[in-house]
Amino acid sequence: EGLGTLLPYRPLLRALGEGRPLLGLAVHDSDAYLAIPAEHLNACLGRRYAEALHRAGLREVDLLGYCSGGLVALETAKSLVQRGVRVRQLDIVSSYRIPYRVDDERLLLFSFAATLGLDTAALGFPAPERLGQAVQAALAQTPERLGAEALAGLPGLADLVALRGRVLQAASGSADAASVERDTLYRLFCHSVRASQAAAPEPYVGALRLFVPDAGNPLVPRYAEALETQWRAAALGACGIHEVPGGHFDCLGEALAQSLSKPMPEEASR
């Protein structure tokens, strides 16, 4: 989920309850995480996680990854299969390879704040729909990159330094509380975003289920279409695609838990 934590998964974990064993994978060594080149991050983490799961004696697993965690889950599944571990189910929730380079930090700050559950409007950001329109307009001019000042013309976003200060202060709760941890968390997030821009690797030999929030995400134009195209190419097996309520930043909850807990009817795939 970009932060290297399980924070966004908490509503889903509560909804799934205690009827099954659950294991969460998170970043515990920030320096080691940041030292991995972004273009190799997902594959490297996938190999490390697969090795750890195999070493722990697991020979059959279900995997779920959200946001950038979906890309890591994909690489973990590949490495597990190579080690003889059966991946019963690979579930991908609102995850994407960003198809352009993000040079405008304003979009990173918006996504960081939204991932933390902060009030983006109170921080000065426009509505997600307006932000998405501006992103699409900018990419129409330069499809491979979002320029450094692409969003500067939006109300409240001209002063990047002030915007960054507001977001980082809100992330720690006060001007000076936990500033080191807060700044490290932001660096982790930006590194994860850069990793999400890396070229797509070879496909996974198995099947997967993709869960797409109906409200989408302003980071990726034509969100549902983009995700479907990407993930169909990422798996050689079947790719079941299912819509869940909410937007990218709030789709992990009871509705998703119910979808995960029941067999998917064949007609739900497209």
Model-derived regions: residue spans:
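A hydrolase-biased, glycine/serine/histidine/acidic-enriched motif that marks catalytic-domain neighborhoods
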Residues: 1-270
